[in-house]
Amino acid sequence: MAQNSSLIAAELEALRQTIRAHEYAYYVLEAPNIADSEFDALMQKLRALEAASGLPIPADSPTQRVGGKADNRFRNVAHHIAMLSLDNVFNADEFADFYRRLQEQLSPTTAISLIAEPKFDGLAINLRYENGILQRASTRGDGITGEDVTQNVRTISTIPLRLNTHTPPDVIEIRGEIYMPKKAFYALNEQAAANGEKIFANPRNAASGSLRQLDPRITARRQLAFFAYGYGEITNYQLPETYEALLEQYRAWHIPVCSLHQKAATLPEALAAYQQFAKQREQLPFDIDGVVFKVNRFADQQRAGFLARAPRWAIAWKFPALEKTTRIEAIELQVGRTGAVTPVARLQPVTIAGVVVRSASLHNAREIARKDIRVGDTIFIRRAGDVIPEVVSVVLEKRLPDAPVFAMPEHCPVCAAAIVQNEDEAVARCSGGLHCPAQRVAALIHFASREALDIRGLGEKLIQQLVAQEFVRTPADLFCLTADDWASLPRMGKKSAHNVMTAIDAAKKTTLARFIYALGIRGVGSVNAQALAAHFGDLAAFMAADRAALQEIEGIGDVVAADIEHFFADEDNRAVIAAIVAAGVHWSTELTKKIIDAPLLGKTVVITGTLPSLSRAEAQKRLETLGAKVTSQVSRQTDFLLLGADAGSKLARAQAFSVPIIDEAQLQTWWQHYGNAV
């Protein structure tokens, strides 16, 4: 019986190997060596044999690509080694500067060997293989933590569930890009349009949306593909000497690798490679938005090192934004939190690089005058960096003879208050302050934001309703709303009303730094707010400070000091602050005074690993309360590394930079001494 089981197991494994070889030939090499009907017959045979054998079906069997129930969420997973992004350049001069910096650092007298490859426009992914078997796939996320999308990635036919080798590494994380080929994208949108469903703006969005489907069977139908271009954690595997050799190793393992990469041994060769990719761009079967250049030798990569969020040994040279022509149908004005009145062009919809553009900021009246932009004009528009719509110029030959010259109105379009403009500022501003509904909404959104009072559940739509119903004029009014007020809002149930009231009540307990930031003083971001709180230690002292006293603080220049002084000179602002404090918003003055002497004040801290009792969010909040700035990457500017269990590459980098290491116990000690008044 045991012998029969062994024979059956061997037969099953041989059949699986045969099918894997055919999958690789079909999906990766695009050179099928059997007919579709023959492949289907092999799959049917494998399913039947697996069912009849009674043996456990391994996770890497070709029959296990699609299946499983729909999930209602994606689990967050921490990357063992951070997934860094790349710095960008946008022209030959900037690229030449990058190349010269590398040459000075690595080899002043000889050329540097680079690899040029397409910058794929998709979704970065980390594939973790353990003993050759795909165990987990996770998105980049914020570079530190991503989402577990393993079940969906298993449905992508170009990604092997098992590496094609008898001697796989114990662990290897293969990094690359999941993308949607243009052909699949067009077919998907055609089908969606025929069904009356929402269409995707571009292949990148389609790839991202398809990968994050809760039902893996939907992902399986979306024809996603993958290219490898890097690595993460590796155990029991010796990297080859060059990146080019690693790609060859991936290819041998049946990991898809783009064949378009090319060597560039000199700066002129690198410039030529960029031009070649730019010419090929439109003809490629997948979207690219630039060219990535990497140092070929891994030893040279290690010597070049890393910046805070990107490697020094690689750069992404983005393509110039694609330009199209369209027509300006109207110029509307938007009013922001600080009263800035921004003209916005409403455009005849135009598709640029797969994205429908309907509007573009014109920034200010001076910019409109400089470009002589008028309603009715035909204009060239591009997506700067392939992202932000930008009006480049006007096609004067197509201008209508009666096209009116734009003039900034004298009064705010929202509240009718006077629009004012300082001579030294390009931005015009509404003088209405919190009397202006548009400024009121923006100020309330800022006040409730995560870095300010962090009022959970109080979003833009809810704030707009409160302002429209005239329940709220200033942030102080939020703390006076009753259950009846909340219940009277459209679609506001009792539970939702209770939740938001609870969140508002919880937000009363805050820190002086958060409160200062929440006030929305022009030029005072979260970092400046922390510095101001630490310096003055008391709200009254901060409000009484003159411009000279403010400028003693690092980061507070003459302009910001003047803005702070102007803010507190307004009696309405002072009245709102008094009302907020009277409503119960408070912080520990003793804590703020203690923090001035705290060892973490003004320090940069990185967290790595799993802490014994605190979550990462809790630890970060305590660090920030104690005056620290928490960042995600270790650099020479890092002051402390907060170390937990199962730390990744950050520990090694911290040791290389001689960064002092602290643990949760040390943080708890500081918290007990400096922060327990919160």
Curated annotation (Swiss-Prot):
The active site is at 119 (n6-amp-lysine intermediate). Disulfide bonds: none annotated. Zn(2+) binds at residues 412, 415, 430, 436. Its cofactor is Mg(2+); Mn(2+). It is an enzyme of class 6 (ligase). Residues 595-678 form the BRCT domain. DNA ligase that catalyzes the formation of phosphodiester linkages between 5'-phosphoryl and 3'-hydroxyl groups in double-stranded DNA using NAD as a coenzyme and as the energy source for the reaction. It is essential for DNA replication and repair of damaged DNA. This is DNA ligase. It comes from Dichelobacter nodosus (strain VCS1703A).
